Amino acid sequence: MLPDQANDLRKLVLRAGRGGGLNDAPPPKIVVVAGGKGGVGTTTVALNLSVALAREGRRTVLVDADFAGPDVAGLCRIDEQYGAADVLAGRRTVHEVLQRGPGGIQVLPASRGLTDPSDCTPQAQERLIAQLEGLGPHADFVLLDVGSGTGRTMRRFWEAADAVLLVTHPDTVAVMDAYAAVKLVCQDNPLRGRILSLANCVPDAEAAADVHGRLDRACRRFLALKVSAAGELPFDPSVPRAAAEQHPFLLESPAGPAAAGMNRLAIEVPRLVEAESPLHTHFRRRAE
């Protein structure tokens, strides 16, 4: 599907989802939370960042788009009978499958209906994206947990995002995998949003700065892309403990070091996302 066709389809689907009426509310900011490999904590980050944003007064929707390994429903203790897979297939609308999650967020689980996201047609991808963009009257931020997937559907989510928050660990392999994910997604399709980096499970600020620096230098040198440091999360034993109890660590241990880092992230991410360059703004207006 050509870009103009995709944009036309998205507007049609969005208009249908709104019942054909006019909606002057700006679309929510869409942030994709991704990792270069499994196990770096994308779901934990996406869930707790959603809660932290809600505590900052930002109406937030969390979408489980990691169809290969959906974990959001379990961590939120909600039913996953219907979800994003049903929206992609046209069986349900986003409004029909949104559920209330912890900490005042809204959650769109993945559901069990999609085993291979590469099977999604361009029309299905645009259907979901259009409905998420139509949540402006109800949401300020939409966070998509895409895990470590870089297939066609995941790449489309990256392209549609206002920002991609790339989660990585401090080890060399994790940083290399994060760079490889950016290269794979961006080599053929430029992103309209920013790329942000989050250093997870770091021992100190120096290690976090090293992670951000290595990733940014590699992307600048070989891809001509800038990666902005969004923050870091220190290793905190309360994080795996809260995950085992199916509870956000931000609510389980609000005074812990990881919670402090997440609260800082909830301030920094909106600042970076909302500070659009003229190029990004121009691109978005053309797309809409």
Q: Residue ranges of each PLM-predicted region?
A:
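NTP-binding/hydrolysis catalytic cores, primarily Walker-type P-loop NTPases
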Residues: M1, A244-E288
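Extreme N-terminal, non-catalytic leader segments
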Residues: M1-G39
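Walker A/P-loop phosphate-binding motif and the immediately C-terminal alpha-helix
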Residues: P26-A68
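P-loop/Walker-type NTP enzyme "switch/lid" segment
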Residues: G35, L62-P137, R241-P248
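Amphipathic alpha-helical transducer elements in NTP-driven molecular machines
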Residues: Q81, R91, H95, Q125-I129, ...
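Conserved catalytic-core segment of NTP-binding enzymes
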Residues: F141-G231
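Beta-strand-loop-alpha "switch" segments that mediate conformational coupling across diverse proteins
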Residues: R221-L250, M262
